[in-house]
Amino acid sequence: MVGCLGDDEFGARLRAGLAAEGADVAGLRAIPGAVSGLALITVDPAGENSIAVAPGANGLAGAAEVAAAFAEPCDVLVLSAEVPAAALAAALRQARAARVRTVLNLAPVPGEAAALLAEGPDWLVVNAQEAAAVAGQPADGVPDDPARAQAIAASLAKGPAGGQVVVTLGAAGAVLAGPPGTAVVPGFVVTAVDTVGAGDAFVGALAVALASGVDPVAAVTAACAAGAAATTRRGAQEGLPRPADVLAATGFSWPA
């Protein structure tokens, strides 16, 4: 895990929580005088969430974090748009030179989205609203229209990035576009209590599945299962499922 934290109680708690889960936190830099990024999350009775974010130290990630990302060999590099676009672009270039596969999650969509796609991420992951924003199209109705989401994904896959594009559709699953074509990956039926962290679970599971060597459709299927399982548990980090949780919630067995 690479990024910036504030030199505060929240940063200490975040570092300790990640370390307790077995994450290597050597790449987390505490910035003196900075505050850690925070999110205020509300969840409605149906389990849907809304989030207000104060980026804090996330906005200070730069060359040191890019260097830390490549301090050890890796199979897949996951990049979040919650850090400055300049750092993301530098990491994409270095990953390409090192032949490391990249998964770019453009959430939220930055003003530099087009420039980042021009850096050629291997995978782009966005939700329906984000996909429409990146494509310069109206977002109205996209989450409920898989055919339109598929068309947007296909158009993005033919753009500067030229890699695999995934548009997540919540409970409906996801759309995959890229070589050799497009596919709709259905969601898993679960009883959702809290959708916080579902997108994070999706992206993390996708990266792990890709590192295990499965094909794109299988990787997105695993990601859909993990995202669905995350909605059956409350909380953000504490709600992220393990393979046994995914199996219990969805019946999906993690790729061997």
What positions do the PLM features span?
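Conserved N-terminal subdomain of the carbohydrate kinase-like
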Residues: 1-76, 247-256
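Beta-strand->loop->alpha-helix junctions that form or flank phosphate-binding loops
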Residues: 2-7, 26-36, 105-107, 165-169, ...
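Aromatic/hydrophobic pocket-lining residues that form π-stacking "cages" and hydrophobic walls in ligand
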Residues: 14, 90-93, 226
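A generic structural signal for well-ordered alpha-helical segments
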Residues: 18, 95-96, 157
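Short gly/ser/thr-rich secondary-structure transition/capping motifs
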Residues: 22, 56-62, 103-109, 185-186
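Conserved beta-alpha-beta core of the PfkB/ribokinase-like small-molecule kinase fold
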Residues: 74-151, 172-174
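Conserved phosphate-binding/catalytic region of the ribokinase-like
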Residues: 111, 137-256
